[in-house]
């Protein structure tokens, strides 16, 4: 793969979002992994972020999943659910969410909590039509309380 061009990679990933950009990043990443890291995925989060296309969230995912680092990757689901249920105080950025969750969730639970929040966001606390009636934690949910308070006053 280090010798592959973006044009060679593209047909394999054309069905995903932003395939041109991702093909370019994958080609650059493969070269860099071989040339600078001996073909090994680095365990250091800062080193991971040097790879083309790898930002903080992706580095944290790799760190948590592959290297069992006690970090909290924040994607759209983690961000939304954390704000809705009150794990954060309506944070404005993924970084604020990450830092707040890392402060209050026991560090050994962070990688698992990341998956819990993603799954909850994908299947229960969805972006457009959250399934509050099916939610096992609606009793403690800030959004649920606010929505019910609003509907009672209308």
Protein language model regions, located:
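Catalytic cores of DNA base-excision repair glycosylases
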Residues: 1-152
């Amino acid at each position: 793969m280090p010798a592959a061009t973006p044009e060679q990679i593209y047909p394999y990933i054309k069905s995903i979002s932003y395939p041109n950009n991702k093909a370019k990043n994958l080609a650059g990443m493969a070269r860099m992994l071989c040339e600078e890291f001996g073909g090994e995925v680095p365990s250091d989060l800062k080193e991971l972020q040097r790879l083309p296309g790898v930002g903080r969230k992706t580095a944290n995912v790799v760190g948590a999943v592959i290297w069992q680092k006690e970090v909290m990757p924040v994607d759209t689901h983690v961000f939304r659910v954390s704000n809705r249920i009150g794990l954060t105080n309506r944070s404005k950025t993924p970084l604020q969410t990450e830092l707040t969750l890392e402060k209050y969730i026991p560090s050994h639970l962070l990688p698992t909590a990341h998956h819990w929040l993603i799954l909850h966001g994908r299947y229960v606390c969805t972006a457009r039509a959250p399934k509050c009636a099916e939610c096992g934690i609606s009793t403690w949910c800030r959004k649920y309380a606010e929505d019910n308070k609003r509907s009672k006053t209308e």
